[in-house]
Amino acid sequence: KPGRAFERVDYRFDVLTDYGAFRDLQRHRMLTVEWQRLTPNHGYVRPELIDEAGMADVFDDAMARSAALYDALKDEFPEQASYAVPMAYRIRYSMQFNAREAIHMLELRSSPQGHPSYRRVALEMHRLIAEQAGHRAVADAMTHLTVAAPELERLEAERRAEQRRGS
């Protein structure tokens, strides 16, 4: 467990992720999050599984219809229009937290059970703390960080869960 001295160092990240990843990341209590209103303006992330299932056209059509609904609502109902925007659309936000919270959050959000979209964010934050901020000691204190490729770890976790259900 990191000591109180880690509370003296602060980080601020500007992030652009799908809304689902944002919802998971913003849940942490010891951070400040400011976000733009959810709109279709930043585009969306189409999961690879959609492509593998041959459903890219259907998915893209659904995203286009939701964007059209948003556009129809935004002038008269600006506060409610974001309800027409699916979680696959990206949202821009900033996150500010201290090093102690970074250790907790990045170790938790890099775990194999996590969704690949927020795992990628956690790993990139870890890299930026070490390399751009030059805080290698803080990055090295994250001893439970999982650095394996997010997609492969999630697949392996799903396989283990399936084996448990089948046995």
Give the residues covered by each predicted segment.
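A conserved ligand/cofactor-binding region detector
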Residues: K1-S167
